Swiss-Prot record:
Transmembrane helices S5 and S6 form the ion channel pore, which is surrounded bymembrane embedded helices S1 to S4. The S4-S5 linker, which contains two distinct helices, undergoes conformational changes upon calmodulin binding to open the channel pore. GO terms for biological process: calcium ion transport; cardiac muscle hypertrophy; cell volume homeostasis; cellular response to hypoxia; establishment of localization in cell; hepatocyte apoptotic process; macropinocytosis; monoatomic anion transport. Residues 284-345 are annotated as: Calmodulin-binding. It is found in: Cell membrane; Cell projection, Ruffle membrane. This is Intermediate conductance calcium-activated potassium channel protein 4. Homodimer. Homotetramer. Heterotetramer of potassium channel proteins. Interacts with MTMR6; this interaction leads to selective dephosphorylation of PI(3)P in a lipid microdomain adjacent to KCNN4, resulting in a decrease of intermediate conductance calcium-activated potassium channel activity. Interacts (via the C-tail domain) with CALM1; the calmodulin binding is constitutive, does not require calcium and mediates calcium-dependent gating and four calmodulin molecules bind to one channel tetramer. Phosphorylation at His-356 by NDKB activates the intermediate conductance calcium-activated potassium channel activity, and conversely it's dephosphorylation by PHPT1 inhibits this activity.
Length: 425
């Protein structure tokens, strides 16, 4: 992976080419991981519904899983080799051993371990090659404990989804994103892409995430419950139990019977609470006013409060005059009635004035940055124009002063008497 040092425009071309290759490798790795998971699900369902009848086909499916796993491991190594080459290009290195750190080696080994876990392609000890069960009373016709754990561990390959989404999003390949991100010290990682899609397509992201979690956890729960030949192990029951647990309803008509099933339901409830919080945040943001709507609403409320203040002030003056009038006439009953109305009008006027003041403070605090930028730009242009005009006037004054100096010099030379000529003796 070493070689000559590439700088300048060649380094940019090399970086773009490496990112394109990483994108293709990550895409194919995700395809192979999905293929392996699909074959694993097919093997488990065939074993559940058909038992030992199709033992040769089950062995063939296991061999295909092993083959896809081998290709996946090769792609994982190739991807990290491209990562090392990209690091060497960015930092101007020649020796790949300098770019390969211990942390990266540990990450590569961990990924190889996670992606390499799969059911071993061996026939079940409970089945013969003829497709008959050796001990029909002891074997329930499903995966053993070790094989079930290896099968479920293949779901850990889904960690490749964020990597493929990051490379497919175009953020790393966009020069504008990289330039602005470098100026603002923003790292374009998986969380940035998740926030990006959460802001641009929140409905699609939450729907896909929710459906994916439902289907995955429902199948995992069915596998866990089938180990004990429980009635909850049917996929239809788990497809009902998982959404009810996800939505934190819990009718109690279907319950898990195994320890692993209870753990899956607990994790499903926690994920449901998190997704519900995200959904509430998205809905609250969608129900908020945008800038134009907020300005219109504040403007109309300002007019409404100003009108109420005028009406309250007019009512206060009216009741004060009526109170003064009935006090002069010695009508104590009417005077007390109008005094109560006057105090109520004073209270209403103070309340409306307080609301109007709060609205003004809220409007003043909502300073639009773009508007402020435009105001500053206009102010800068005005100052520049004034400065240029002042410089022109100063230049004009300087020219007039030079001309006046020349005129004064000429006038003084004309008024100076001629020097007497000395005659030769």
């Amino acid at each position: 992976m070493g070689g000559e040092l590439v700088t300048g425009l060649g380094a940019l071309r090399r970086r773009k080419r490496l990112l394109e290759q990483e994108k293709r490798v990550a895409g194919w790795a995700l395809v192979l991981a999905g293929t392996g998971i699909g074959l694993m699900v097919l093997h488990a369902e065939m074993l559940w519904f058909l038992g030992c009848k199709w033992v040769l086909y089950l062995l063939l499916v296991k061999c295909l899983i092993t083959l896809s796993t081998a290709f996946l491991l090769c792609l994982i190594v190739v991807f990290h080799a491209k990562e090392v080459q990209l690091f060497m290009t960015d930092n101007g290195l020649r020796d790949w051993r300098v770019a390969l750190t211990r942390r990266q080696v540990a990450q590569i080994l961990l990924e190889l371990l996670v992606c390499g876990v799969h059911p071993v392609p061996l026939r079940s000890p409970h089945c013969t090659l003829a497709g008959e069960a050796t001990d029909s009373q002891a074997w329930p016709g499903f995966l053993g404990e070790g094989e079930a754990l290896l099968s479920l561990a293949m779901l850990l390959r889904l960690y490749l989804v964020p990597r493929a989404v990051l490379l497919r999003s175009g953020v790393l390949l966009n020069a504008s994103y990289r330039s602005i991100g470098a100026l603002n010290q923003v790292r374009f990682r998986h969380w940035f892409v998740a926030k990006l899609y959460m802001n641009t397509h929140p409905g699609r992201l939450l729907l896909g995430l929710t459906l994916g979690l439902w289907l995955t956890t429902a199948w995992v729960l069915s596998v866990a419950e089938r180990q004990a030949v429980n009635a909850t192990g049917h996929l239809t029951d788990t497809l009902w139990l998982i959404p009810i647990t996800f939505l934190t309803i819990g009718y109690g008509d279907v319950v898990p019977g195994t320890l692993w099933g209870k753990i899956v339901c607990l994790c499903t409830g926690v994920m449901g609470v998190c997704c519900t919080a995200l959904l509430v945040a998205v809905v609250a943001r969608k129900l908020e006013f945008n800038k134009a709507e907020k300005h219109v609403h504040n403007f109309m409320m300002d007019i409404h409060y100003a009108k109420e203040m005028k009406e309250s002030a007019a009512r206060l003056l009216q009741e004060a005059w009526m109170y003064y009038k009935h006090t002069r006439r010695k009508d104590s009953r009417a005077a007390r009635r109008h005094q109560r109305k006057m105090l109520a009008a004073i209270h209403t006027f103070r309340q409306v004035r307080l609301k109007h003041r709060k609205l003004r403070e809220q409007v003043n605090s909502m300073v639009d940055i773009s508007k402020m930028h435009m105001i500053l730009c206009d102010l800068q242009l005005g100052l520049s124009a004034s400065h240029l005009a002042l410089e022109k006037r100063i230049d004009g004054l300087a020219g007039k002063l030079d001309a006046l100096t020349e005129l004064l010099s000429t006038a003084l030379q004309q008024q100076q008497p001629p020097e007497p000529i000395q005659e030769a003796t």
